[in-house]
């Protein structure tokens, strides 16, 4: 909104030109969402508690989790609300992909909310039927992909920088230029990325602050990548694809990072609120959508290796038990394996954060090492 008002009424005033700078608006977006989250945090927690939106605990889960029972959930409402408000204030709403990101983040959050509502209010064990949830995820992802690949993601001829590419091309880390031309397979591949990412983050959200912190680190990293990818000088210097308008995604990502750091204030151990599927589904899906916009789908395997390992641990555990009758891990997802192994919850979370920072550094290094 501020950018729109400046561009419409005040672009002749040099003193207000700062509102046109992406770096300034990104920083302000992060601070705004963070302080909105701080300000509304206790109010939202009390509101959720009053409505009996409370967490239930797995019967077969670690005994230490019994104390978490009854903690308010659906805190993802706080994250998505702060994010959208900040983007509305500081984002360039003329950038169609900012609108698309915001709308589809809200769609995934609504899907997660419906699942949480069924579990915590309707007391339906397991919440929404897995098949229904999966099909709705596919539908939302499909609409996003159609909009991006056929409308908002089309790059005008002559605006691809030093590295020419098609929007359906696939890039690999440490490799200069596109590796595969996906063509018609770009949409099903992208749907797989979004759904895989959303469910992987959902599985990671099992300890106080674990998903919040690791996603925040990934979001900050992608914000840096978005900025350099959307700036022709840096994109050409680094020999990465120049994506017109991508630097505006850094405003969206900064707002999301601010909301996550603000939420972590209340979600750190011992958690006063959980994000629930309302938060984890939309956060994972947003990571997936962002890497598609930035042509960094494969990089997410490195940057989000924690989420990948959490999802793989569940797949391996289920597969091993069905085939051999034996379990590989004490419990899946992976963080519960360490927990049952005697490692304290806070130590697991902090170690995972450290690993996430290392993965972020490696991911950023791929911009130059190729």
Curated annotation (Swiss-Prot):
Main location: membrane
Any GO CC annotation of this UniProt entry: plasma membrane
Enzyme class label: transferase
Transmembrane segments: 31-51, 73-93, 98-118, 135-155, 177-197, 209-229, 251-271, 273-293, 298-318, 347-367
Pathways involved: Cell wall biogenesis; peptidoglycan biosynthesis
Chemical reaction(s) catalysed: UDP-N-acetyl-alpha-D-muramoyl-L-alanyl-gamma-D-glutamyl-meso-2,6-diaminopimeloyl-D-alanyl-D-alanine + di-trans,octa-cis-undecaprenyl phosphate = di-trans,octa-cis-undecaprenyl diphospho-N-acetyl-alpha-D-muramoyl-L-alanyl-D-glutamyl-meso-2,6-diaminopimeloyl-D-alanyl-D-alanine + UMP
Keywords: Cell cycle, Cell division, Cell inner membrane, Cell membrane, Cell shape, Cell wall biogenesis/degradation, Magnesium, Membrane, Metal-binding, Peptidoglycan synthesis, Transferase, Transmembrane, Transmembrane helix
Known cofactor(s): Mg(2+)
Coiled-coil boundaries: none
Topology in membrane: Multi-pass membrane protein
Any one GO BP annotation for this protein: cell division
Disulfide bonds: none
Lineage top rank: taxon: Bacteria
Localization: Cell inner membrane
A molecular-function term among this protein's GO annotations: phospho-N-acetylmuramoyl-pentapeptide-transferase activity
EC assignment: 2.7.8.13
Protein family: Belongs to the glycosyltransferase 4 family. MraY subfamily.
PANTHER family: PHOSPHO-N-ACETYLMURAMOYL-PENTAPEPTIDE-TRANSFERASE, PHOSPHO-N-ACETYLMURAMOYL-PENTAPEPTIDE-TRANSFERASE HOMOLOG
Role this protein plays: Catalyzes the initial step of the lipid cycle reactions in the biosynthesis of the cell wall peptidoglycan: transfers peptidoglycan precursor phospho-MurNAc-pentapeptide from UDP-MurNAc-pentapeptide onto the lipid carrier undecaprenyl phosphate, yielding undecaprenyl-pyrophosphoryl-MurNAc-pentapeptide, known as lipid I.
Protein name, per record: Phospho-N-acetylmuramoyl-pentapeptide-transferase
